[in-house]
Each structure stands twice: as structure tokens, then as C-alpha cells.
A protein has these predicted regions:
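Bacterial N-terminal signal peptides
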Residues: 1-10
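Folded, non-transmembrane soluble domains that reside on the lumenal/extracytoplasmic side of membranes
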Residues: 13-173
Length: 227
């Protein structure tokens, strides 16, 4: 009976994993202004399309005393953050009621976003949160994560001057034009095959939110802290 009671207590202490997000920035408590939330969401969506790396931000209230690190690992795995086989994802969890931040890093990015680097990013965010600069804190954290992944110098500002815009590069434009021309030739020479290809591409992502990943292995890499 004692063993059953201990097991029951352990399960009761576990905070539930939230539903997988459908966007790159989920703010369930209104920490961010709508403009900042939209801007960061677009920034991270563009970054994923440009690099393949998946960085997400989830903002909630409290875990009611449950261990943050254990919950973050379970949530990261359940959401499958990052690409399958690469696990190149980072999740920033912010618990406003607990005044806590967790940066969970997938195995594929642990070489770039080390535990020490993750701790430094949280240290950049904490004083801004204490001062009430919520938008600036999260924007700073996001830009610091991206700069760290790319190995760019980081001075701690909220908008690095050398940060990429996240939109298509010249090479991507050229490849897109070549792909369009190739499809046009295929449509003329083999119209049925072209239509099948178009249908396959159009339906490949149905049933998934824009966020959907395939990774999720982290092993607890990253850091956590409070403000």
C-alpha cells in the first residue's frame, strides 16, 4: 500500500503536458503584446523555413510546484520539437506565475546552444522581466537563441544588426524560379504526372499545424532560471 501511495504521489506531482502548439509563439497568459507575439511568431516561422531549425516559445502560468526540468523534457519530447533524425529544436518555456524560464535544447543543437550559453540567455532575459519589459525580454531571448545557433556575435540587444530577416535568400529565389520553370515544362510534356505531383505537395501537410515537428529528443540539455 505504501508503494502504491508513493507511485500515486509521484504521478500527482507531474504537471500535465500542454497540447502541442500550432504556432511558433504560444502565449496563453497575455505576457506579450499582440504586436510582439505576431512579430516573433513570424520571425521564428521564417527562421525555420530558411534554416530548418525549429525554435518555439510557450508562455503559461504555473506548474503548481511540479519540477520544471522534468516537465520541460516530457513536453519537448511530446511535441517532437525539431526535425526527425536531427532533433534540431529549441523550446523556450516561460512560466509567469512561477517566475521561471526553461530553455530546452535538442540533441542536434547542443553543440551550439550549450548549457552555459542557455544560462547566459536566461540571464539576459531575467532583469528585463523584473523591470516589466516583457516584450523586450522575450524578444531578446529569441534573438539571442538564434544568434547562438548561428554562431553570431551577441551583444545583448533585442535586435542584432547582423540578424537575418528570415525571408528568402537570393539562392532560394533562384532555386524557386528554376523549380517553377521545371514544373512548367513537366506540365506541358507530362500533364497527368504534373497534376499528381502538385496534389501530393498540396496535401502533404494537411492535418498538422504550422508548428508540427518530428524530433523531440533533448535529454535535458539547456538551462533554467528565475526572475
Amino acid at each position: 500500500m505504501l508503494a502504491l501511495a508513493i507511485v500515486a504521489a509521484l504521478f500527482a506531482a507531474q504537471a500535465a503536458v500542454p497540447p502541442a502548439p500550432t504556432r511558433w509563439v504560444e502565449d496563453g497568459v497575455g505576457l506579450l503584446s499582440p504586436a510582439t507575439r505576431s512579430a516573433l511568431d513570424a520571425r521564428l516561422e521564417g527562421y525555420q523555413h530558411a534554416t530548418g531549425h525549429q525554435v518555439v516559445v510557450w508562455i503559461g502560468d504555473t506548474l503548481d510546484g511540479a519540477p520544471l526540468d522534468e516537465w520541460a523534457v516530457r513536453t519537448f519530447a511530446a511535441w517532437k520539437v525539431g526535425r526527425q533524425g536531427l532533433d534540431d529544436g529549441v523550446a523556450m518555456f516561460i512560466l509567469v506565475g512561477d517566475r521561471a524560464i526553461d530553455l530546452e535544447v535538442g540533441y542536434g543543437l547542443e553543440g551550439q546552444v550549450t548549457d552555459a550559453a542557455a544560462a547566459q540567455i536566461i540571464a539576459l532575459m531575467a532583469p528585463r522581466l523584473r523591470a516589466g519589459d516583457r516584450d523586450g525580454a522575450v524578444t531578446t531571448g529569441v534573438e539571442a537563441v538564434l544568434a547562438t545557433i548561428e554562431g553570431r556575435p551577441w551583444t545583448g540587444g533585442s535586435t542584432p544588426t547582423d540578424a537575418p530577416a528570415g525571408g528568402p535568400t537570393t539562392l532560394q529565389w533562384i532555386l524557386g524560379i528554376l523549380a517553377a520553370l521545371g514544373f512548367l515544362v513537366l506540365a506541358i510534356t507530362h500533364p497527368r504526372f504534373a497534376m499528381m505531383l502538385l496534389w501530393t505537395v498540396a496535401t502533404a501537410g494537411r492535418g498538422r499545424g504550422g508548428f508540427a515537428g518530428g524530433g523531440g529528443r533533448s535529454g535535458g540539455g539547456g538551462a533554467r532560471g528565475r526572475w
